[in-house]
Amino acid sequence: MSSTDQPLSSDSPSDKPLLFLAHVQALKQLPRTGWLFAGVAQPESVADHSFVMSWVALLLAEQINLAYHEQGLDQPLDVAKIAQIALVHDLAESILTDLPKRSTDLLGKAVKHQAEALAMQQICQHLPNHAHYLACWQEYVDGATPEGRLVRDADKLEMIHQAFCYEQAGQRNLGEFWQAQQWHYPLSRNFFEELWRLRHHHS
């Protein structure tokens, strides 16, 4: 066996990005369980959701930054930070899987958050700047920064947009995904209201 054929040592610095990417790769095979319980035969994966949600977040952020004072902000959003928060927000599911709402309701928010935090520590230990990415994830969970709140809006908007797409393809009984939505930014509400209008226009 040549030196290039040797497997990477678990102590090799070059192995760490691959260990991290194994978690990212796992999200491509992990279905979003909410759609499964709703009867969607071939639902999107967590990776599908994260990719589109990242774009929703970026589009919202860039639009908000054109007139950020009108959205209740004192300064423009950090678009690079938003992209990082969006990309890490569901990484814990590579270990915990996409827990259905009925499970998280029984476990409680505190238990779920503790498990997610442990999973994120395990995943991000392979990154050179692991503390930064853990902080990005915490910003999403807490929603205590303008960027974290924007990504939380984008997460819900992507779900609702996906529900809209499934309904346009003939799926029924997805009304629960449209209910009781609260928004941090007026632009997010506008996005939702436009989807709502289109939904009823096509019904």
Where are these regions (language model features)?
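Alpha-helical, largely C-terminal catalytic domains
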Residues: M1-S203
